[in-house]
C-alpha cells in the first residue's frame, strides 16, 4: 500500500475544505427535512368523523385530528362552529351547531388543512325541525287564543298561588309502586269556592301541580285513567270559571324523570311523550288562559350530591323539547298555546348557565320556569334540622342566614334578565318560607314578621324584574286560604304579597 502523507490527509487544506463542504450539505439536508416535517406530512381525520349529522335542536360532536406541527380549521356557515381554528399534532375538536329554526334541512362543511397535505372536508348535515304526526291531530284553531306573545301574556298574570300537595300527592310503596289520590296527603279536593277566594284576594294565576303515574289504567302504555283526568279537568274548569289563569304540569310522581342520562333518555322521552299526548288532547279545547308546564324540578337522583354533568343538562333540556313537540303535534288550540319549560332543577343559576330554549313551530309562545327557595335554612330546611327563624335587615345579627338576604335576592332574580331582555318571560313557579309554628312567644312573633318581610321582598323583586311569582301553598297550617271555604287563612301573608305587587 502506498503511504499517504499527512499533508494529503484529513487535516490538509484540501481535506478541511472537503469536511466543511460535507457539513454544509448535511446541515442543509437536515433543515430541509425539518421544514418538511413542520409544514407537511400526514393529516388524518378518521372516516367516522367525515360525515356528522345533527338533529334540529343543535348540539356538539367531538372529532379527533391527527396532524403535523400545525393545522387549521374553517367552517362554511356561521351556525356551524369549531372549538379550534388552529392546532398542532393530535387533538380533539368540538364541532357545534346552533338550533335549526329554518324549517328546512341545512348543510355545512368543515375544512381541515395543513401545509403540504391535502385538505380534509367534513360534511355536516342538520335536520329540519318537525313535530310528531298523530292521527288525533286537527288543524290549528286560534279561537280564544289571543294574538299575544308569552312576554305580553306574562304582564297580565302578575302573581299567583299554588294549590300544592293535592293533585300531585302520591304514596310511594317500598317496591316503588305509586298509589293515592288528591286527598292522600291530607288536603281536601279543590272546589269552586277556593278558586273564587283566590281570585277575590287579588291573585291572577293558580298553579295546579298534578301527578298521573299513580293513576295508570295500563302501565305498559302509560294510559291514564279517564276518571282521574275528569277530576283534574273539574279543578281546571272551576279555576278558569273563577277568572284565573291556570297552569297544570307533570309534577314529581316519585321522581321517575330524575335520571337524566343518555342511557335512560329514549325510555324517559317515550313515557313523557305518551303522557303529555293524553293531557294535551284532553285539554286541547280550552282557551289561552290554560297553560301547560312540562315537568317540575328535574335533577339527577343518582348523582350522590355531585354537580350535574353536561349530559344531565342536555338530556333535561331534551325533555323540554319532547314536551313542546308533543303538545304542538295535537293541533287545534294547542298549536298556539303558551307553554312553560323548566331549567335544570328549576334553579336560577343553572338556568342562566345551561338552559337551552326548545325549538317551536310558533314564535314567542314559551315561558321559562324557575323556583326560588333561598336561603334554604330559612325557607325549606326541615323543622328537625338547624333552621333559621329570622330573615332580613330588620333582624340583622339575629337568627338569620349568612346568605339569601336582600342583596342576594336582588342579584339572583335580576340575573334572569338575560331571558327577559330576549323576550323570554320567566315564571317563578314556587317560592315561600316554611311556617315554623312550633315556635312560641317573641320568637314566633319575629318569625312571622320575617316570613312576611321575605314574601313581600321576593314579590317586589319579581315585579321589578318582570317575573311572575307563584307562592307555594302546601295547605296545612301555612296555607294562605282555607281549602274548604276559600276564605283567607293567613291574611297577613296575602297582604304581604299584594303589597309587593304595588
Curated annotation (Swiss-Prot):
One of its GO terms (biological process) is xyloglucan catabolic process. Disruption phenotype: Cells are not able to growth on xyloglucan polysaccharide, This phenotype can be directly rescued by the addition of xyloglucan oligosaccharides. Keywords: Carbohydrate metabolism, Cell outer membrane, Glycosidase, Hydrolase, Lipoprotein, Membrane, Palmitate, Polysaccharide degradation, Signal. Its EC number is 3.2.1.151. Optimum pH is 6.0-7.0. Its main location: membrane. Residues 1-32 form the signal peptide. Pathway: Glucan metabolism; xyloglucan degradation. It is a lipid-anchor. GO terms for molecular function: beta-glucosidase activity; xyloglucan-specific endo-beta-1,4-glucanase activity. Residues 67-127 form the BACON domain. It is found in: Cell outer membrane. The BACON domain was initially thought to act as a carbohydrate-binding domain. However, it does not bind carbohydrates and may rather be required to distance the catalytic module from the cell surface and confer additional mobility to the catalytic domain for attack of the polysaccharide. Belongs to the glycosyl hydrolase 5 (cellulase A) family. Gut bacteria supply the human body with energy from dietary polysaccharides through glycosidases that are absent in the human genome. Xyloglucans are a ubiquitous family of highly branched plant cell wall polysaccharides present in the vegetables we consume. Enzymes involved in xyloglucan degradation mediate the conversion of otherwise indigestible plant polysaccharides to short-chain fatty acids. This is Xyloglucan-specific endo-beta-1,4-glucanase BoGH5A. It comes from Bacteroides ovatus (strain ATCC 8483 / DSM 1896 / JCM 5824 / BCRC 10623 / CCUG 4943 / NCTC 11153).
Amino acid at each position: 500500500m502506498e503511504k499517504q502523507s499527512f499533508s494529503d490527509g484529513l487535516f490538509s487544506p484540501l481535506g478541511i475544505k472537503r469536511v466543511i463542504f460535507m457539513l454544509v450539505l448535511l446541515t442543509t439536508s437536515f433543515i430541509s427535512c425539518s421544514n418538511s416535517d413542520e409544514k407537511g406530512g400526514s393529516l388524518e381525520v378518521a372516516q367516522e368523523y367525515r360525515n356528522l349529522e345533527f338533529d334540529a335542536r343543535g348540539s356538539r360532536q367531538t372529532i379527533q385530528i391527527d396532524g403535523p406541527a400545525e393545522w387549521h380549521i374553517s367552517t362554511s356557515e356561521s351556525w356551524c362552529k369549531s372549538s379550534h381554528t388552529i392546532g398542532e399534532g393530535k387533538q380533539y375538536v368540538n364541532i357545534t351547531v346552533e338550533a335549526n329554526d329554518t324549517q328546512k334541512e341545512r348543510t355545512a362543511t368543515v375544512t381541515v388543512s395543513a401545509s403540504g397535505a391535502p385538505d380534509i372536508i367534513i360534511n355536516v348535515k342538520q335536520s329540519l325541525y318537525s313535530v310528531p304526526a298523530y292521527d288525533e291531530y286537527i288543524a290549528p284553531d286560534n279561537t280564544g287564543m289571543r294574538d299575544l306573545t308569552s312576554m305580553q301574556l306574562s304582564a297580565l298574570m302578575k302573581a299567583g298561588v299554588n294549590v300544592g300537595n293535592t293533585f300531585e300527592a302520591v304514596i310511594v310503596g317500598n317496591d316503588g309502586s305509586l298509589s293515592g289520590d288528591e286527598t292522600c296527603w291530607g288536603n281536601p279536593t279543590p272546589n269552586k269556592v277556593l278558586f273564587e277566594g283566590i281570585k277575590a284576594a287579588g291573585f291572577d294565576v293558580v298553579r295546579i301541580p298534578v301527578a298521573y303515574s299513580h293513576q295508570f289504567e295500563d302501565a305498559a302504555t302509560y294510559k291514564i285513567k279517564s276518571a282521574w283526568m275528569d277530576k283534574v279537568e273539574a279543578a281546571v274548569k272551576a279555576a278558569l270559571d273563577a277568572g284565573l289563569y291556570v297552569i297544570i304540569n307533570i309534577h314529581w310522581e316519585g321522581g321517575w324523570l330524575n335520571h337524566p342520562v343518555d342511557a335512560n333518555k329514549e325510555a324517559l322521552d317515550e313515557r313523557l311523550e305518551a303522557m303529555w299526548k293524553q293531557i294535551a288532547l284532553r285539554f286541547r279545547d280550552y282557551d289561552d288562559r290554560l297553560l301547560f308546564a312540562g315537568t317540575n324540578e328535574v335533577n339527577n337522583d343518582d348523582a350522590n350530591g355531585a354537580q350535574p354533568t353536561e349530559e344531565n343538562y342536555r338530556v333535561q333540556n331534551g325533555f323540554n323539547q319532547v314536551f313542546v313537540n308533543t303538545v304542538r303535534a295535537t293541533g287545534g288550540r294547542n298549536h298556539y298555546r303558551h307553554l312553560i319549560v323548566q331549567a335544570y332543577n328549576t334553579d336560577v343559576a343553572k338556568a342562566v348557565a345551561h338552559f337551552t330554549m326548545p325549538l317551536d313551530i310558533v314564535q314567542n309562545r314559551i315561558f321559562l320556569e324557575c323556583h326560588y327557595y333561598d336561603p334554604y335554612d330559612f325557607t325549606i330546611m326541615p323543622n328537625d334540622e338547624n333552621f333559621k327563624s329570622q330573615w332580613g335587615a330588620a333582624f340583622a345579627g339575629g337568627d338569620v342566614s349568612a346568605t339569601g338576604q336582600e342583596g342576594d335576592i336582588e342579584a339572583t332574580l335580576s340575573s334572569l334578565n338575560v331571558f327577559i331582555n330576549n323576550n323570554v318571560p320567566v315564571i317563578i313557579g314556587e317560592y315561600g318560607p316554611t311556617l315554623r309554628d312550633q315556635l312560641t312567644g317573641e320568637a314566633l312573633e319575629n318569625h312571622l314578621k320575617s316570613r312576611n318581610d321575605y314574601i313581600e321582598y321576593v314579590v317586589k323583586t319579581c315585579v321589578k324584574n318582570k317575573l311572575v311569582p307563584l307562592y307555594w301553598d302546601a295547605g296545612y297550617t301555612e296555607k294562605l286560604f282555607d281549602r274548604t271555604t276559600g276564605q283567607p287563612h293567613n291574611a297577613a301573608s296575602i297582604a304581604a304579597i299584594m303589597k309587593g305587587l304595588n
